C-alpha cells in the first residue's frame, strides 16, 4: 500500500525542516567559531598594544624633554585606545558570540522535535503496513481489518497533529533565527563602529602629540649634553687666563723695533768710552 498524498506531503515537510535545522547548525557553528576567533585575536592585539605602551614609556624616560613629553602623551592616548578595545572585546563576547553559542541548545531541542515527528511518521507507516498485511491474510475478517484501520487512523491523526506542531515550532524557529541573525550582525557592526570612531578620535590626538615634538629643541639639548656647562665655564676661564698672562709677561723692549734696540746698545757703548777718557785725563793732571 502506497502512502497517502497527505503522508507524502508531511514527509516532504519533515525533510525540508530537517535540512533547515542542519543548515543552521552547520553555519551558526562556523560563525560562532569564527567570531570567537575574531574576539580572541582582538584581545591578543590589545595585549600586544599594552606591551607597546609599556616600552614606549620606558624609552621615553631616556630621551630629551620634548621627545619624552610627546612619547609619554602618545603612550597615554594609545593606552586609552586599549580601554576601548577591551570594551569592544567584552561587547563582542556578550552580544555576538554568546547568542551564537546559545543556538547549540536551540538546535538540540529542534532535533528532539524532529525525532518525535519522525517517530509518529514511523508509527503511521507501520500501522499502514500492518493493515495491508491484515487485508492480505484475512480479507474476510472485518473485525481485525476494522481494528487495523482504527489503529492506522489513530496513528495518522497523531502524525498529522505532531507534524502541525512541528511546523508551527519550526516556523517560530525560523522567525526567531532571522530576527537573531539580523540583530547579531547589527550589534557586530555597531560595536565595531563605536570602537573605530573612538579609535579615530584617540589616534588623531596621539598623532598630534607626535607632531608637537620639537626636533630643533631636542637636538639643541643633545648638543649641549656633549658640552656640560661646568666644562664650558672652565674652558672659557682657561682661555681668558691664557690671554691675560701673555700680555703681562711681555717686556717693554719687546715692543721696540729691532733697529731701535741696536741703536740703544751702541749709545750705551759710546757712553762707556767717554767715561773712560775722562778718567784718564784726570790721572795725567
From Swiss-Prot:
Bias (Polar residues): 241-261
How is this protein positioned relative to the membrane?
Answer: Peripheral membrane protein
GO cellular component terms listed in the entry, alphabetical order: centriole; ciliary basal body; ciliary base; ciliary transition zone; cilium; cytoplasm; mitochondrial inner membrane; nucleus
Name the UniProt key words of this record, in alphabetical order: Cell projection, Cilium, Cilium biogenesis/degradation, Coiled coil, Cytoplasm, Cytoskeleton, Differentiation, Flagellum, Membrane, Mitochondrion, Mitochondrion inner membrane, Nucleus, Spermatogenesis, Transit peptide
Q: Tell me one GO biological process term.
A: spermatogenesis
The region called BAR-like is annotated at 11-221
Q: Which domain of life is it from?
A: Eukaryota
Compositionally skewed regions (Acidic residues) per UniProt: 267-285
**According to the UniProt record, where is the region Disordered?**
241-285
Transit peptide located at 1-48
> Which residue stretches, if any, does this entry annotate as coiled coil?
142-184
Q: Where in the cell is it found?
A: Cytoplasm; Cytoplasm, Cytoskeleton, Microtubule organizing center, Centrosome, Centriole; Cell projection, Cilium; Nucleus
CDD domains noted in UniProt: BAR_FAM92
**Predominant localisation class:** cytoplasm
| Similarity remark | Belongs to the CIBAR family.
What does the record's free text say on domains? The BAR-like domain displays limited similarity to other BAR domains.
Q: What does this protein do?
A: Plays a critical role in regulating mitochondrial ultrastructure and function by maintaining the integrity of mitochondrial morphology, particularly the organization of cristae. Plays a crucial role in ciliogenesis. Plays a key role in the correct positioning of the annulus, a septin-based ring structure in the sperm flagellum, serving both as a physical barrier and a membrane diffusion barrier that separates the midpiece (MP) from the principal piece (PP).
User: What protein is this chain from?
Assistant: CBY1-interacting BAR domain-containing protein 1-B
Which organism encodes this protein?
A: Xenopus laevis (African clawed frog)
